[in-house]
């Protein structure tokens, strides 16, 4: 791996994070007002709250943003602490949608229909439409829609750039040893939590893991604990937003953290026992884009059931 590959990797990462930020901000502006009304009205029971949290987070692609809104609603008295719990649970599952979208980048079939599903096939068109709307749109809604499309195209281009740049890492012994270390579940959880805390987005963190999977050195045994840690790291944003709020709003942020920490402890313990006793072969297999998306969803669903 040359210095140019490193620079390409850094550039791809920057484009990916920038695109996700632009898309997320534009989605919140485009639908934020309506979604806030939905959040405040459709949370009278746990199931309604759960479905609302899932739906809102699927739209704005950020469980952190949804949870921050929930903390604000609890602080203002619009939502009770009890109502917030269902929304937080739904938000945790809604955030997995991003990984499923990114997993389309791993399609390698020669089938024309499957090829059309690859983001590299349609993102140039989205970028063109987004540019036209952003430059020539008269209303703020059209401009925001343009920003959403451009943001999505940018993050997918960044993802593709990262995937191409990291391919050379597969032959570097130090990189191979690094992911062998991450097979230690505790270390994997810590790495996932720290990375997500730094970039403030579990979706982006999972996307980076998906890009690294192209090397073939990321096993499911290493990926699963990292995914668990990513769910803990994403709680930091809500905790920070709760500073200066009332007691119940702080409790809502703590509920979010507790929900993910307890879920991680329970499932990590089970995962470690299964790994040590049964040694399933799948844990040694190389993770894929789709496999990581599936693992991310299954873990969040399992935490919600718990």
Predicted features along the sequence, with ranges:
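Hydrophobic alpha-helical transmembrane segments of multi-pass integral membrane proteins
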Residues: 42-69, 185-208
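Structural signal for the N-terminal portions of transmembrane helices
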Residues: 116-120, 149, 249-262, 281-306
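Membrane-embedded alpha-helical segments of transport systems
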Residues: 59-66, 85-101, 119-126, 155, ...
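Interfacial loop-to-helix junctions that mark the boundaries of transmembrane helices
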Residues: 1-7, 109-121, 175-180, 221, ...
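Membrane-water interface regions at transmembrane-helix termini and the short interhelical loops
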Residues: 75, 129-144, 244-248
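Membrane-interfacial helix-loop connectors
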Residues: 69-84, 88, 99-121, 159, ...
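Hydrophobic core segments of alpha-helical transmembrane domains in multi-pass membrane transport
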Residues: 9-22, 53-57, 126-137, 150-162, ...
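Helix-loop-helix hairpins and the membrane-proximal interhelical loops
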Residues: 1-46, 145-194, 212-215
């Amino acid at each position: 791996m040359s210095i140019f590959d490193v620079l390409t990797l850094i550039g791809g990462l920057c484009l990916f994070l920038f695109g996700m930020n632009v898309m997320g901000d534009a989605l919140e502006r485009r639908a934020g007002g309506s979604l806030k009304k939905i959040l405040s009205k459709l949370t009278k029971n746990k199931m309604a709250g759960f479905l609302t949290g899932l739906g809102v987070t699927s739209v704005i692609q950020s469980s952190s943003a949804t949870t921050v809104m929930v903390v604000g609603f609890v602080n203002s008295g619009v939502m009770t602490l009890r109502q917030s719990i269902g929304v937080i649970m739904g938000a945790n599952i809604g955030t997995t949608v991003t990984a499923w979208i990114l997993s389309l980048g791993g399609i390698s079939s020669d089938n024309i229909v499957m090829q059309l599903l690859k983001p590299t096939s349609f993102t140039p068109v989205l970028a063109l439409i987004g540019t036209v709307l952003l430059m020539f749109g008269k209303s703020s809604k059209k401009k925001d829609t343009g920003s959403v499309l451009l943001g999505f195209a940018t993050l997918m281009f960044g993802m593709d750039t990262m995937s191409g740049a990291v391919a050379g890492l597969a032959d570097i012994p130090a990189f191979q040893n690094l992911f062998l270390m991450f097979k230690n579940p505790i270390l994997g959880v810590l790495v996932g939590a720290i990375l997500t805390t730094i970039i403030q987005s579990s979706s982006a963190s999972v996307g980076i893991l998906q890009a690294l999977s192209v090397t073939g050195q990321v096993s499911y045994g290493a990926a699963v604990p990292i995914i668990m840690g990513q769910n803990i790291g994403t709680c930091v944003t809500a905790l920070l937003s709760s500073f200066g709020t009332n007691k119940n709003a702080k409790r809502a942020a703590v509920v979010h953290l507790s929900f993910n920490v307890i879920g991680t402890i329970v499932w990590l313990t089970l995962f470690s026992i299964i790994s040590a006793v049964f040694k399933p072969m799948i844990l040694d297999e190389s993770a894929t884009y789709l496999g990581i998306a599936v693992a991310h969803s299954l873990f969040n669903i399992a935490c919600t059931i718990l």
